[in-house]
């Protein structure tokens, strides 16, 4: 089998290539807006115009008011601000209990752990075996001193989409603020903050073909988590620091483009996703899909290959020019099994052999077929050299023979 002449990039959940239009806007802002957007003279006003335009574009994409949108450095900062800022605000009302899921992004998980060390209490809701959080489980966990419910909109590893609207309704019924980490959702599926009914929502530009180092936090009017960064009066006095003018301009343009063609993008990525899932599960023995098939992000495939280590598969794929991952890029240096897979009941030894493939609008059916061709060659060859796989097959054969006696 011959390698493709170009690199096949299938790790769009980790980061996405910057859209040419967004890059063009970034260069335009860098070369043309040399002033500080807080300054009261012509070049300062020019810089502020880039910021205002970017803010309006992002707000429109999620059906928010520009005044409800605050720029940050990334999705992780937005998550930290929403969780810790709410905790510090509500602690003044003696509300020191928070609710989240057991398979959130580490920006949420580690923020919650930090709050626990400060004396806050956190309830972690276990997802179903298919990777969904049930609103009734959230409601059962709410207490009189609950300050916040934070449930991600779409899981970054297995792609399952959560019933955020229903969970928000439960939270509000009990007077609790609702936050969702929508980093994987914004630009990938429709996101309407009014329809969802959330109080806060996190996003990150580099997940929808914008630049790295740009994020935002939506805060519904009247919802103010305590500042984490103090200093100047930027972002309506809620997030100090001179704005990243070029990053904001590029973020706005990228999201404008992503949402303008969202239906076509979703249909295209869903076709690639379903092709890979169906073919791999049919042709590779004991391959298993992690997470339910619906509702699921259009671009997400997460499959376990028992008997193998994901890192081994990753290296083989790289040799064939395919870029993929074994899970979250934010935890790629760790050899620990994925907390996401463990939370949905995937055994540790199977979780170690999991691969995540995530598509973007630039990917083609030819690339999806090439991925399957490579997997159908690599997996059997690696299993033939795997003591873990061969031992498991021998054990299964012995049980089968005993059953026939």
Each language-model region and where it sits:
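Pyridoxal 5′-phosphate
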Residues: 1-405
């Amino acid at each position: 089998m011959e390698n493709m002449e170009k690199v096949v990039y299938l790790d769009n959940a980790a980061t996405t290539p910057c859209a040419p239009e967004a890059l063009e806007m970034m260069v335009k802002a860098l070369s043309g807006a040399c002033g500080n957007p807080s300054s009261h003279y012509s070049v300062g006003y020019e810089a502020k115009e880039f910021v205002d335009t970017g803010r309006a574009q992002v707000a429109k994409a999620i059906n928010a008011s520009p005044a409800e949108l605050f720029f940050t450095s990334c999705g992780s900062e937005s998550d930290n601000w929403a969780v810790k800022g709410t905790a510090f605000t509500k602690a003044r009302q003696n509300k020191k209990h928070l609710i989240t899921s057991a398979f959130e992004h580490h920006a949420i998980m580690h923020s919650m752990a930090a709050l626990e060390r400060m004396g806050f209490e956190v309830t972690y809701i276990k997802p179903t075996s298919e990777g969904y959080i049930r609103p009734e489980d959230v409601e059962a966990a709410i207490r009189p001193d609950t300050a916040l419910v934070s449930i991600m909109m779409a899981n970054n590893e297995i792609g399952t989409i959560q019933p955020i609207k229903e969970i928000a309704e439960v939270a509000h019924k009990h007077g609790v603020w609702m936050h969702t980490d929508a980093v994987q959702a914004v630009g990938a599926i429709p996101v309407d903050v009014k329809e969802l009914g959330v109080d806060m929502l996190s996003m990150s530009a580099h997940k929808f073909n914008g630049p790295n180092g740009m994020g935002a936090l939506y805060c519904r009017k009247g919802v103010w988590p305590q500042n984490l960064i103090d200093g100047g009066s930027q972002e309506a006095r809620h997030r100090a620091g001179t704005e990243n003018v070029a990053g904001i301009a590029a973020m706005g343009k990228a999201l404008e483009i992503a949402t303008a063609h969202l239906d076509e993008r979703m249909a295209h990525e869903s076709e690639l996703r379903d092709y890979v899932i169906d073919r791999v599960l049919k042709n590779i023995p004991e391959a298993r899909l992690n997470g339910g098939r619906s509702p699921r992000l259009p671009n997400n495939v997460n499959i376990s290959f028992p008997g193998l280590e994901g890192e081994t598969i990753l290296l083989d794929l790289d040799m064939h020019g395919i870029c993929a991952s074994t899970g979250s890029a934010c935890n790629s240096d760790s050899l620990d099994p994925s907390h996401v897979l463990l939370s949905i009941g995937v055994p540790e030894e199977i979780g170690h052999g999991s691969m995540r493939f995530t598509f973007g609008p630039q990917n083609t059916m030819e690339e999806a077929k090439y991925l399957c061709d490579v997997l159908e060659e690599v997996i059997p060859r690696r299993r033939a050299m795997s003591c873990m796989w061969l031992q498991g097959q021998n054990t299964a054969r012995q049980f089968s023979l005993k059953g026939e006696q």
